[in-house]
Amino acid sequence: MEQTCDDIDEMFSNLLGEMDMLTQSLGVETVQTPSPKVTNEEFSFTVGFKDLNESLNALEDKDLDALMADLVADINEVEQRTLQAQKTSGNQQSVVTQPSTGTNNDFCSKLSPCATITGQFKNDLPPPPPAPDLDLPPPPPPPPPEPLSQEEQEARAKADKIKLALEKLKEAKIKKLVVKVHMYDNSTKSLMVDERQVTRDVLDNLFEKTHCDCSVDWCLYEVYPELQIERFFEDHENVVEVLSDWTRDSENKVLFLEKKEKYALFKNPQNFYLANKGKNESKEMNDKSKEALLEESFCGASVIVPELEGALYLKEDGKKSWKRRYFLLRASGIYYVPKGKTKTSRDLMCFIQFENMNVYYGSQHKVKYKAPTDHCFVLKHPQIQKESQYIKYLCCDDRATLHQWVTGIRIAKYGKTLYDNYKCAVKKAGLSSQWANQGTLEPAAPTGSLSAGAVQANGQIPRVVLPSSAEVAETQKKVDPAIRA
């Protein structure tokens, strides 16, 4: 009998061992929990500053007052909703029938002897000694505060506002960022940007603060010092979303400067649509022909992407060596011709698609990556902030080819939205020019915004009003003489 039990135990032990070995060989995969959404406590409220306190100190007084008004309004709205929800839940609970208390009474009766014993012990304790009666003189009154100067009073008032703003920001319903913007004259300005605003709204705010002309060439410019890449924000992009992709220790910067490349496409479309066709029209074109070309390219059933193709240098992954390949631009992405194949559609290989990708200009990549020339552009996902194998580097032979490829990618990615952005910028520039001619410094209010969530300075959501192509051409003649070039 004992031998049989020993055999059973041994068999059972062997079975457990085999099960352990089988489990280890299969490997148990752990299910990764999804990353939680960033709460207001984890959300970084500043870009370009050491901390939130420093950024609030950098705000102008009127901007700080406007921030406080917005925060108080947001929090009051949340409190009203909370009170309403509590009232509703209270009414629902009052309808529910109260449970019987018989069981509770029985339970308390069982505990009553313990309570009686505890009370008896308390009664046996001696009373505490009386407090000593000491005749101490009263403390001297505090010295009267010295009167504050006007500057000290203003500084204390601002410090109180900042302290309150720090508390309210964490309770606010709408995300707000204090952004340090580097100006064209090497100075900086601090702006409060909320999650409803697009680039066009921020540019309008900067126009009001700087009183500079509202040329269509002004832009917000994103610079990555570590990767040595840069690009301009498109006017319809949500600024807070873009900046939220930056890491907390990022050295990235936001610049406010003029870049003719931003809307060069609409001033001289022939340089992008006809340059590779060998036509004489690509050199000179009158205003009427330019307008017709833009209408044909952007206002038809679908947006026409420039027929762009040619040899480019491709940086190999993880190396500082470059290979020359033949690339073609299509609406869905960039394709290349494999070695020994033809340019027919069936032989083309997809290099990259534009969904969730941004295009950047490279800066000094000839030194950093041993590129053949300094005319480089880069394609990467917005959330990639460090060196990565998923970043694509391409190099062109000359500057004109570089601008053609970057502009062609923007057309393929954004389509007619790019043209709408330009028309809105031209309209804004025309209104600003009219105000300047009337001798007033008051900036013109925008006629419309590019997104339904965009907000004007007065807190109202503007109606989208885009000018016709004829109005754009007429306004552009007055504002930008370069259109005749």
UniProtKB/Swiss-Prot annotation:
List UniProt keywords, sorted A-Z. Cell membrane, Cytoplasm, Cytoskeleton, Membrane
User: InterPro entries of this UniProt entry?
Assistant: GRB/APBB1IP, PH-like_dom_sf, PH_APBB1IP, PH_domain, RA_dom, Ubiquitin-like_domsf
Query: What are the subcellular locations of this protein?
Result: Cell membrane; Cytoplasm, Cytoskeleton
Pfam families reported for this sequence: PH (PF00169), RA_2 (PF21989)
Keyword set includes DNA repair: no
Could you provide one GO biological process annotation from this protein's UniProt record?
signal transduction
Query: What are the Pro residues biased-composition ranges?
Result: 125-147
Give TM regions.
none
**Designated name of the protein:** Amyloid beta A4 precursor protein-binding family B member 1-interacting protein
Organism listed in the record: Gallus gallus
